[in-house]
Amino acid sequence: MKRIVLFWIPLLLLLLVNCTTESFDFGDQEGILVGGSGGGGSSQPNPTIPEGSEDLLGFTIAFDESDKTAYGSMSETVTSDDDFIENSQFASVVTIIYNGTTAAVSNGVSGVEVSSNGAHVVVNSTVSGVEYVLSGTTTNGSFKVYSEKKFKLSLAGVSILNPVGAAINIQSSKRVFVVCADETTNVLTDGSSYTATTDGEDMKACLFSEGQLIFSGGGSLTVTGNYKHAITSDDYVRFRSGCNITVASAKKDGIHTNESVIIGGGILNISSDGDAIQCEEGGITMTGGFAKLSTTDNKAHGLKSCLDVVISGGAIQAQVAGAASKGISCDGNLTISGGKLTAFTSQTALYEDNDLSSCAGIKCDGNILITGGEIAIQSTGGAGKGINCDGSITINDGTVKVITTGTQCVYGKLDSSAKGIKANGALTINGGT
């Protein structure tokens, strides 16, 4: 009996790959979406499923509501890394209490100067070991920092709306520990347009920093980016266990960095028009936590990395609604050794700039290595892909489920079909389910 089982397992895997990589038509889908000039796009009927093959698709794909608790509440091991606030001390405290159009400042720290114009507060600091504690509510205020040293920014039940700029603007290239005080609710909102800034200063998000942003604490933070991005660092952003960050909406990206994004724990709920999380020049690492990602624009991705993406733990739930959007878009290599990814794409392919681009749960320009974890992808739009890799794909372990149901898209001499798993290089399956 064992020999029979061992014989059928590789045969079943082979049938699954063959079945889901064809362009089977499960129903009428929309045609191609043209983003550039000209016409000529269409949807073409695809081959029908061979009799009996539908039995191979005896599974469904859905978001598991228990993932938020199971992965979001996981603890994180504290190391000697400078990103862990446990390795730093902040003995000096400056408090700012917002109240409508004013702000009350308590500052007894030598080397820290605080000025205010109504509820718009500006800090200039030349000393280390300072904690700034923000609380209260303003509908016309902000918090801006110039500092030569790393500092702690405690959000202790604060709500800041700045109708003409960023709610928090950190003009410092040093590390900032953003701590949401336990059992507090914090809200940051910017305006739909910004007034002119000081020459040479960047300001492109509701919460902006020139340096690293390290999020932690047991409270919650909700950010709305009405102008551009919700949270931006010109360096990197790290999310630690215990944090609870919501991007209610963003006109561009939810989280945008010049460098990398590290997700070690916590709960992220990001809704954006553009990419939910984008790294312009860095990679993305996820070892724990829960990230629910929702995007609406064409070519807007759940995770967008210009380098490698490495996932060893945590759970990602991505729903991308725009044409040619991806759950994960990786310019480098993708390695998945643990955790859980569930991704849904629903739109059709997009013709733009002489290129025909389709939706995909995963799109990787480099190589993909899967040694563990759970991957579940459903792509229902025209020419949608489950996993689309320009390099090679190697699956040694883990669970991979893919459902694609879109029609073929044709534009002139270009065409694209729905595929479960597509690799331009080698596709090697050594194990897994």
Annotate each predicted stretch with a short phrase.
Residues 1-6:
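Positively charged n-region of N-terminal signal peptides that target proteins for export
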Residues 9-13:
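Hydrophobic helical h-region of N-terminal Sec-dependent signal peptides
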Residues 15-18:
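C-terminal motif of bacterial Sec signal peptides marking the signal peptidase cleavage site
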Residues 20-433:
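A composition-driven surface/loop motif
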